[in-house]
C-alpha cells in the first residue's frame, strides 16, 4: 500500500537546490536517465547496475523511501546512481535548465500517486511547467516514458504530453498502449501489479523538433478539458 503525501502542503513547496551531476556522479559526462517518483528505487538501482555507461537519478517526495534508496545507491559503489528528496514540480525545473546540452537522454514517470480527481489536478506529478522543462532539456530523439496501472492517472499525463506538441510516439508502438516496458527492470509497483495479472498502461514518447508552446496556453487548454485523453486519442 503506497502512502500519499500532499505535494501542495507548505513543507513540500519549499524549493531545494539539487546537486549538479558533477556532485552526484563519478563520471558526470555520461548520459542521464531521470526517474521522477522513483519510490524505493528498485528500477533505478537495477538500471544503474545493468548500464554502467549511464548515470541514473531518481527523485522522490517521500523522504523515508529516499533515505533507504539513496543508502543502497551509495553502498553499491557504482558511482552512477543517486536518489534525491524533492518535490519535482518545485525543484526540478532549475536543475534541468542547468544541464549541459544533450546530457539528459531519458525521463520516466512510473506509477505516480493516483490523484485522478479533477479537484486534485494540481497534486499530479506531471504538471505543464514540469513537462515543458523536460521537453526543453531533451534533444530530438530522446525519450519520455510514462506508465501506470490506473487509467485515470495516465490519461491526463498522455493528454498533456500530446497537447504540448513536443513529443511523438514511435510508429511501431501499439495504440493506445504500448505492449511492453522498454526498461529492463520493473518498479516495485509494476512487479506487484503484474503478479496480480492486472493491466499496465504504457506510452513511450520521443522528443521531436517542435518548439515549446506558450506555457500559459498549454496550461489553460489542459485545464479546460474535462476528459482530455478522450479528445487526444481520437487523433492518434
UniProtKB/Swiss-Prot annotation:
This protein's name: tRNA (guanine-N(7)-)-methyltransferase
Function: Catalyzes the formation of N(7)-methylguanine at position 46 (m7G46) in tRNA.
Catalytic reactions of this protein: guanosine(46) in tRNA + S-adenosyl-L-methionine = N(7)-methylguanosine(46) in tRNA + S-adenosyl-L-homocysteine
Gene: trmB
Entry keyword Cytoplasm: no
Enzyme class: transferase
Pathway: tRNA modification; N(7)-methylguanine-tRNA biosynthesis
Domain of life per record: Bacteria
Entry keyword set: Methyltransferase, S-adenosyl-L-methionine, Transferase, tRNA processing
Pfam families the UniProt entry points to: Methyltransf_4 (PF02390)
Keyword S-adenosyl-L-methionine: yes
InterPro entries: SAM-dependent_MTases_sf (IPR029063), tRNA_(Gua-N-7)_MeTrfase_Trmb (IPR003358), tRNA_methyltr_TrmB_bact (IPR055361)
GO cellular component, one term: tRNA methyltransferase complex
Binding positions (S-adenosyl-L-methionine): 35, 60, 87, 113
Binding site for substrate: 117, 149
Signal peptide positions (record): none
EC number(s) per entry: 2.1.1.33
Amino acid at each position: 500500500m503506497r502512502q500519499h503525501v500532499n505535494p501542495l502542503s507548505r513543507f513540500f513547496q519549499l524549493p531545494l537546490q539539487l546537486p549538479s551531476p558533477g556532485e552526484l556522479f563519478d563520471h558526470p559526462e555520461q548520459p542521464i536517465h531521470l526517474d521522477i517518483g522513483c519510490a524505493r528505487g528498485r528500477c533505478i538501482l537495477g538500471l544503474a547496475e545493468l548500464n554502467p555507461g549511464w548515470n541514473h537519478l531518481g527523485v522522490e517526495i517521500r523522504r523515508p523511501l529516499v533515505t533507504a534508496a539513496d543508502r543502497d545507491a551509495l553502498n553499491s559503489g557504482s558511482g552512477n546512481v543517486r536518489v534525491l528528496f524533492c518535490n519535482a514540480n518545485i525543484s526540478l525545473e532549475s536543475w534541468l535548465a542547468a544541464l549541459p546540452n544533450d546530457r539528459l537522454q531519458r525521463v520516466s514517470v512510473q506509477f505516480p500517486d493516483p490523484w485522478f480527481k479533477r479537484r486534485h489536478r494540481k497534486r499530479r506529478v506531471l504538471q505543464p511547467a514540469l513537462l515543458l522543462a523536460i521537453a526543453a532539456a531533451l534533444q530530438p530523439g530522446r525519450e519520455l516514458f510514462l506508465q501506470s496501472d490506473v487509467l485515470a492517472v495516465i490519461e491526463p499525463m498522455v493528454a498533456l504530453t500530446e497537447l504540448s506538441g513536443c513529443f511523438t510516439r514511435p510508429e511501431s508502438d501499439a495504440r493506445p498502449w504500448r505492449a511492453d516496458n522498454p526498461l529492463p527492470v520493473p518498479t516495485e509497483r509494476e512487479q506487484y501489479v503484474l503478479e496480480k495479472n492486472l493491466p499496465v498502461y504504457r506510452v513511450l514518447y520521443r522528443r521531436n523538433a517542435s518548439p515549446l508552446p506558450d506555457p500559459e496556453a498549454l496550461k489553460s487548454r489542459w485545464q479546460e478539458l474535462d476528459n482530455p485523453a478522450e479528445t487526444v486519442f481520437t487523433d492518434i
